[in-house]
Structure formats: C-alpha cells, structure tokens
C-alpha cells in the first residue's frame, strides 16, 4: 500500500526549486481561483491591502468581468497567459477543489496554494499522482493557512498584521499554532523570513523536508520553527533528514497532541494515531535525537528560539 509519506517523498524529489529561495517574494504574481465567491473576495481583498501583487482571478462563466478592480477569467490558462501569473490561491468548495488544483497543474502554474478543507482523500490521491508526474508545479496544502513572506507577499488566510520581516522560518501543520509562533517571534524581535502552513491532511503537496531544505539554504533564514502534530510520520522523516543533513541553524519544535487517545481523529484529517504509529512521544524523541530543541508549551516557542539564537551568537 502506498503511504502518504511515500507519495510526499517522491514529489519532493521530483520538484526542482526555482527563485525566490523560499517560493514567494514581492515580485510573485498571484491569481485567485474562486475569485468572486465570498471567501475568495474577502481574502483577496486582504491580500491586496497587504501589498500582495494580485493580478486577477478565475471564476468560470464570469470571464471578461472586473472584480476588486482586477480582471476575471474563465480558466487558469487564460489568466496565466494574460497576466503572467506564477502563483494561484484556491478558495473553492471541497467537491470541486481537486479539479481546481488539477486545472492549475495543467496550466503549469509554478505555485498552487489550496486553502480548502474537507477535500475527499480519494480526490487528493489522484492529485498527488498528477503532481508526481511533473516538475513544474508545487502545491502547498490543502487544508492550510497558506504562505507569507512578511512585508512582501501574503497568499492565504493568515492575519497579516502579526507578521514582521525577519529571520525565522516557520513551517507548521497547524494554522492557529503558526499564528502563535508568528506573534511570539514578532514580540521577541526576531520576525519571520517566510511562514509556510503545509496543512493537516494526510495527502498534501509540500512536506516538512521540502521546507527544511529551503530554509537551510535561504540566507535570510537564521533559525527554524517546526510545528507538528500527531498522525503520520512526517515529523520523524524530517528528523531523519536533519540527521542526514546537519544544519548550524537552530531548530525549535512543538508537537501538538501529547495527550491524544489512539484511534481518535483530533481536528485535522491527518491527526490520528493508528496502528501504533503517529503518537507525539515518538515524534518528540525523533526530533530530539536530531538535535532539535523541543518545547512542551506553544507559549514558549518565541523565547526558546530567541534563547537558541543567542546561544549560537555567543559561541
């Protein structure tokens, strides 16, 4: 049986990274699929106000119209050809979200960010198959808050005002815990280089290892926060990658679900301990063995990464 981890690893090997060093910057041209819907409208407006270079949107049957003073197109291909967009964000209901991702892959959009929660896993298995056959498109999500480079580009539903341009790369399976880490790193004066919410579903497009590779190679990123949760083996695989690819950048982690009972889904579709695997303790031990500093309280992420950054500076 093919596991989510195996599919994710294969995708990571097939994708060839391009500039910018961590996926987005102020030059990224973004379109929105589901542009004229309630969610697409609300979050596109927020992105524009933040300064994101939104260049248009897609709503089938509404091509030729204007929305938020931007052009509306019937297809992703048309939008890409007309605007030069290289990223798309998807606010499409679960029954149609996989088709929206496939359309973006077919159009060879470089970055696809799918916010939608509740996409059937069978649909996502088919999407993963398409992703694994190509090297033009990277998917972030689904069921994620998105990605942000503070002060430059916001693609997703995260609150922009808590972010501050800085030096900490944050990758997380949890949206709200991402915001907690952001608020704390802003409060202690470190700020963030890039924040990536990889999503809480079993079949996602970008995993911890993909993000660790980018953060360790990114000159702006001087420290890393990794937020995991119960379910799957993504954290253990990330720990093994760090053992095989040591970095001098401090890595701090928090794993949610320490007291979660086996066999019960805890929020996200992927947050379930099954078959004796995926519990918080095994993830924590694996990360510690890789030299990661694990905090047992999300309230201490900011002070812990600051401490580790200062320790490195004073060596």
Curated annotation (Swiss-Prot):
Stretches of the chain forming a coiled coil according to its record: none
Active-site residues, as the UniProt record annotates them: 268
PTM comment, free text: Phosphorylated; stimulation by low concentration of GDP.
Catalytic reactions of this protein: GTP + succinate + CoA = succinyl-CoA + GDP + phosphate; succinate + ATP + CoA = succinyl-CoA + ADP + phosphate
Subcellular location: Mitochondrion
This protein's record includes keyword Ribosomal protein: no
PROSITE patterns: SUCCINYL_COA_LIG_1, SUCCINYL_COA_LIG_2
Gene3D superfamilies to which the protein is assigned, alphabetical: NAD(P)-binding Rossmann-like Domain, Succinyl-CoA synthetase domains
Pathway(s) the chain acts in: Carbohydrate metabolism; tricarboxylic acid cycle; succinate from succinyl-CoA (ligase route): step 1/1
Keywords assigned by UniProt, alphabetized: Ligase, Mitochondrion, Nucleotide-binding, Phosphoprotein, Transit peptide, Tricarboxylic acid cycle
Enzyme Commission (EC) number: 6.2.1.4, 6.2.1.5
Record: transit peptide: 1-16
Transmembrane segments: none
Record: residues binding CoA: 36-39, 62, 115-117
One Gene Ontology term of the molecular function aspect: succinate-CoA ligase (ADP-forming) activity
SMART domains: CoA_binding
A Gene Ontology term for the protein's cellular component: mitochondrion
InterPro entries with a match to the protein in the record: Cit_synth/succinyl-CoA_lig_AS (IPR017440), Citrt_syn/SCS-alpha_CS (IPR033847), CoA-bd (IPR003781), CoA_lig_alpha (IPR005810), NAD(P)-bd_dom_sf (IPR036291), SUCC_ACL_C (IPR005811), Succinyl-CoA_synth-like (IPR016102)
GO process terms (BP): succinyl-CoA metabolic process; tricarboxylic acid cycle
Positions contributing to substrate binding: 179
Family designation: Belongs to the succinate/malate CoA ligase alpha subunit family.
Function: Succinyl-CoA synthetase functions in the citric acid cycle (TCA), coupling the hydrolysis of succinyl-CoA to the synthesis of either ATP or GTP and thus represents the only step of substrate-level phosphorylation in the TCA. The alpha subunit of the enzyme binds the substrates coenzyme A and phosphate, while succinate binding and specificity for either ATP or GTP is provided by different beta subunits.
Subunit comment: Heterodimer of an alpha and a beta subunit. Different beta subunits determine nucleotide specificity. Together with an ATP-specific beta subunit, forms an ADP-forming succinyl-CoA synthetase (A-SCS). Together with a GTP-specific beta subunit forms a GDP-forming succinyl-CoA synthetase (G-SCS).
Name this polypeptide is given: Succinate--CoA ligase [ADP/GDP-forming] subunit alpha, mitochondrial
Annotated gene: scsA
């Amino acid at each position: 049986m093919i596991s989510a981890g195996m599919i994710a690893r294969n995708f990571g090997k097939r994708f060839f990274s391009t500039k910018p060093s961590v996926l987005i910057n102020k030059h990224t041209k973004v379109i929105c699929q589901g542009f004229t819907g309630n969610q697409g409208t609300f979050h596109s407006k927020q992105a524009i106000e933040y300064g994101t270079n939104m260049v248009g949107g897609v709503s089938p049957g509404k091509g030729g119209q204007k929305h938020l003073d931007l052009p509306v197109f019937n297809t992703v291909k048309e939008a890409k050809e007309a605007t030069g967009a290289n990223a798309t964000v998807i606010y499409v209901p679960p029954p149609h979200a996989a088709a929206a991702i496939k359309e973006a892959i077919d159009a060879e959009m470089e970055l696809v960010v799918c916010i939608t929660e509740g996409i059937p896993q069978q649909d996502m298995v088919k999407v993963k198959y398409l992703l694994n056959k190509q090297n033009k498109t990277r998917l972030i999500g689904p069921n994620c808050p998105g990605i942000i480079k503070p002060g430059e580009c916001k693609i997703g539903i995260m609150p922009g005002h808590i972010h501050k341009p800085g030096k900490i790369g944050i990758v997380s399976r949890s949206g709200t815990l991402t915001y907690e880490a952001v608020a704390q790193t802003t409060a202690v004066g470190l700020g963030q280089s890039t924040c990536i919410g990889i999503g809480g579903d079993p079949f996602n497009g970008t995993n911890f290892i993909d993000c660790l590779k980018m953060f360790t190679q990114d000159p702006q990123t001087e420290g890393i926060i990794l937020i995991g949760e119960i379910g799957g083996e993504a954290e253990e695989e990330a720990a093994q990658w760090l053992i095989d690819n040591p970095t001098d950048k401090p890595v701090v982690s928090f794993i949610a679900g320490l007291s979660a009972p086996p066999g019960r889904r805890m929020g996200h579709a992927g947050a379930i301990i099954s078959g004796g695997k995926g519990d918080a303790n095994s993830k924590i031990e694996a990360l510690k063995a890789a030299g990661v500093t694990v905090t047992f309280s999300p309230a201490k992420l900011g002070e812990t990464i600051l401490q580790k950054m200062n320790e490195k500076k004073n060596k």
